[in-house]
């Protein structure tokens, strides 16, 4: 990110130096809260299977530190973001399968950072979304890819009523779900204190990394 005029020449030269075409593209910085949205598309319908607040820190490097569901954004802005996502999916010609968006709500309204024909990576589609909605969207995506109807999704989803290029539905969040990343400092982890006590907290759903940490620290 170029923060002021003094960084412009250096940044452009660095970009060109590392470009095969020896060109660079300058794009507007989109300022505003960011969201991750997952959806499944088939038979003229688009079902939102997850909508999470995305937590980005440490500019100008923009490190993703986690997600939280359900979102805190207002319903009107929520609908605007979903409609923009649906228009992007339509423009890309995605008619069957998964779609995901990283999208911001700026002073000019929704602005798309990315739309991809896949589910969210990391822990999102496998853990964070299902923990919030009690819905296995990975299974539903596979069913659609195999030409089958995602019956569980059809039972859980509810229709959204606003103008969009698809018949819109959503699978709503039932519980709060969040995942967070830890940024380490230089050095070697020798011990972790209080881990056993924290893991007995009823609000902790998954502890894979905690088990791994105990193994590492015991070596």
Predicted segments with their positions:
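Short beta-strand/turn micro-motifs at beta-sheet edges
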Residues: 57, 167-168, 214-218
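Glycine-rich active-site loop/lid that clamps phosphate-bearing ligands
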Residues: 182-217
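Residue-level recognition of oxygen-bearing side chains
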Residues: 7
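Conserved anion/nucleotide-ligand pocket segment
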Residues: 1
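Phosphate-binding core of ATP-grasp and ATP-grasp-like enzymes
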Residues: 15-23, 28-71, 79-112, 116-125, ...
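Active-site "cap" helix and flanking loop/linker of ATP-utilizing ligase/carboxylase catalytic domains
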Residues: 79-101, 116-190
């Amino acid at each position: 990110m170029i923060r002021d005029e003094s960084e412009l020449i250096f940044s452009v030269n660095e970009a060109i130096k590392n470009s095969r075409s020896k060109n660079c593209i300058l794009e507007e910085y989109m300022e505003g809260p960011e969201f991750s949205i997952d959806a499944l598309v088939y038979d003229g319908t688009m079902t939102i299977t997850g909508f999470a607040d995305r937590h980005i820190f440490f500019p100008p490097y923009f490190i993703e530190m986690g997600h939280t569901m359900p979102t805190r954004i207002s319903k009107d802005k929520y609908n605007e973001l979903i409609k923009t996502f649906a228009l992007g999916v339509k423009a890309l010609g995605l008619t069957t399968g998964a779609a995901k968006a990283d999208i911001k709500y700026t002073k000019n309204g929704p602005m798309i950072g990315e739309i991809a024909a896949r589910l969210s990576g990391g822990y999102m589609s496998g853990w964070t979304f299902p923990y919030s909605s009690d819905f296995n969207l990975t299974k539903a995506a596979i069913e659609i890819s195999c030409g089958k109807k995602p019956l569980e999704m059809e039972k859980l989803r509810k229709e959204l009523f606003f103008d969009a290029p698809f018949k819109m539905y959503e699978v709503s969040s039932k519980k709060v779900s969040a995942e967070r990343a830890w940024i380490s400092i230089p050095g070697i982890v020798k011990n972790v204190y209080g881990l056993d006590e924290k893991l007995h907290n009823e609000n902790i759903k998954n502890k894979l990394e905690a088990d791994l940490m105990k193994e590492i620290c015991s070596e």
